């Protein structure tokens, strides 16, 4: 039988043998991560580690390594995120400590508003580390959204309404902070009621409100107490209405273009309905 370790490149395997001699495979968690990413739980002595590798062209490992090296300290020092053990950017491999806990996305505890309060609290600490002003952020995103429109498969009338609206938007200087980029239960584990972060592969500097996009679309609509608990933990609601509207429109256009390109009819229809509601 082929082991998950056999999927590693020779260079990755050589590094792993040097870093964790005699390590044994405990669990393959690759299905919880993005396409092109291998995630393996290994045991070495009394300790467990998570090893991530990425296929050529997959940028998530570069982002995660940048996060580890400069921005995850508030979480790692509190035991709320793994610590970096070893890494080789060229070989596209990272070794980190393994966090105990069950995936939050499949845990019954994810229905507890306390988990969302913790999520808000952790995110506020992360965002508060730094901020920069960027005059080009909004104009560049608008140009990208306009370029995507022709590949969405949307009705001409809706495309024209979207184009007209986007070109009318103001382009204010934007405050960017370190963001996680995929802040939702699939990026968390729960250990006896404590939320921990397991994946930072979409780290980048963005507006703070970006990290609420997935929660708002999926979790907050299920139960408004989750939203209230999150904002309590965060200390405020960073979703300034006009900026939030622009983000929602651009995100929906991006998803529509992806769905049209890949043939996901249901997602395409949902994106169309979302955009019709946003730009009636």
Give residue spans per PLM region.
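A cross-family kinase active-site recognition segment
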Residues: 82-87, 98-159, 164, 170, ...
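Active-site acidic catalytic loop and adjacent metal/ATP-binding pocket
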Residues: 33-45, 50-51, 166-212
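Helix-rich C-terminal or lid/interface subdomains of diverse kinases
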Residues: 214-280
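A conserved alpha-helical element in kinase catalytic cores
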Residues: 48-97, 102-126, 225
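A short beta-turn/loop motif at secondary-structure boundaries
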Residues: 30-34, 86-90, 247-248
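Conserved protein kinase catalytic core
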Residues: 58, 103, 188, 205, ...
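Protein kinase-like catalytic domain
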Residues: 72, 123, 127-131, 216, ...
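Juxta-kinase regulatory segment immediately upstream of eukaryotic protein kinase catalytic domains
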Residues: 1-27
């Amino acid at each position: 039988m082929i082991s998950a370790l056999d999927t590693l490149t020779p260079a990755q395997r050589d590094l792993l043998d040097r870093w964790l001699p005699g390590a044994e495979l405990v669990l393959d968690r690759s299905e919880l991560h993005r396409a092109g990413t291998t995630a393996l739980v290994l045991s070495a002595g009394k300790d467990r580690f998570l090893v991530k590798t990425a296929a050529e062209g997959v940028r998530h490992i570069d982002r995660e390594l940048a996060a580890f090296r400069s921005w995850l300290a508030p979480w790692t020092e509190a035991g709320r995120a793994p610590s970096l053990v070893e890494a080789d950017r060229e070989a596209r491999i990272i070794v980190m400590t393994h966090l105990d806990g069950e995936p939050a996305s499949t845990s019954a505890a994810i229905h507890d508003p306390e988990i969302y309060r913790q999520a808000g609290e952790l995110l506020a600490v992360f965002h508060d580390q730094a901020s920069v002003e960027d005059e080009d952020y909004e104009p560049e995103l608008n140009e990208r959204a306009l370029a995507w429109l022709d590949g969405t498969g949307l009705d001409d009338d809706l495309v024209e309404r979207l184009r007209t609206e986007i070109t009318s938007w103001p382009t204010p200087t934007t405050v960017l902070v370190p963001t996680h980029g995929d802040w939702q239960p699939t990026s968390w584990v729960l250990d006896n009621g404590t939320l921990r972060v397991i994946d930072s592969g979409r780290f980048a500097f963005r507006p703070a409100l970006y990290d609420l996009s997935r929660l708002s679309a999926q979790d907050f609509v299920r139960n408004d107490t989750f939203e209230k608990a999150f904002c309590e933990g965060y200390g405020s609601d960073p979703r300034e209405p006009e900026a939030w509207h622009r983000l929602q429109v651009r995100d929906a256009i991006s998803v529509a273009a992806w769905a049209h390109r890949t043939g996901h009819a249901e997602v395409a229809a949902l994106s169309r309905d979302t955009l019709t509601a946003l730009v009636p």
